[in-house]
Amino acid sequence: MSMTLSENRGPNRLAFLRAAFRRPAGAIAGGYIVLLILGAVFAPLLTPYAYDVQSLKDAFQPPSAAHLLGTDEFGRDLLTRLLYGARTSLSVSSISILISVMAGMTLGAAAGYFGGFFDRAVTAVADLTWSFPEILIALILVAIIGPGVSGTMAAIAVAYLAQFARLTRAQIMMLKGETFIEASRSLGSGHAHIIFRHLLPNALAPVLVSAMLATGDAIILEATLGFFGLGAQPPTPSWGAMMSSGSALLFKAPWIIIFPGLAVATTVIAINLFGDALIAALDIRDRLRRDE
């Protein structure tokens, strides 16, 4: 009976994702995110220009039919660099958060399940890390590792590790006393089977929502590091680096900084709106489960 309870939760585990897309704000925000990802992936097919080819005679061209978003100080098409910059910003932020989620969930699950000294150690380190702003942690790590995509990804992953470890630990502490866990244990299931087959899948939904919201913060963090020259290095475009080069040309060619800034702002807003839709869908799911 208890095992049946565990299995019944499985098929509906990610049903709240579909529920989020049924909400108007979730559908609009989710649609924007999907279009942005498609634009980044198929950038070579959407623009005839190369992101790294300079043409000084075309420098500082305002938005026109030939260059929809204008050109930068080196004559490079801004729309092209914006699309390729989306590749950098989205991939760095999403992969970093994915690494952070995987590591944080593993540590948090082990700490919450086994308890004892390991739990106290993980909690102490997580609390210490949690007390510092993510940007400070990222700046310190990038200074140690060095600038570039790899350093930025490592810095962002470590900066958000404590968030997912704490959240997962709390979920595991709440779930490990459930009847289906006791039933699985009484049937002779090992610790690894219980953690990875029963506990982590049922703790995934709130972690997924938190990861979605953290991805928006990670995009801002990646753009900040790029603005200071600590992110992706030239000629690889990134939204932060584009804003950095455009900041000195605000009055001469404002479009160079405006469009990357709008890209960051609209993307983060869309991610947050979709995250809010996920939270609302998750609340409804939990309320229905409590009423059963």
State what each model feature region is.
Residues 68, 72, 78, 102-104, ...:
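Generic hydrophobic transmembrane alpha-helix motif, especially the helices
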Residues 2, 31, 35, 39-74, ...:
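Hydrophobic alpha-helical transmembrane segments of membrane transport/permease proteins
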Residues 1-31, 273-292:
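Transmembrane alpha-helical segments of polytopic membrane transport and secretion proteins
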Residues 141-145, 171-172, 213, 221-264, ...:
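Glycine-rich helix-loop "coupling/hinge" segments at transmembrane-helix boundaries
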Residues 159, 205-215, 254-292:
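C-terminal transmembrane helix and the adjacent membrane-cytosol boundary/short C-terminal tail
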Residues 31-50, 85, 124-147, 157, ...:
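Membrane-water interface segments at the C-terminal ends of transmembrane alpha-helices
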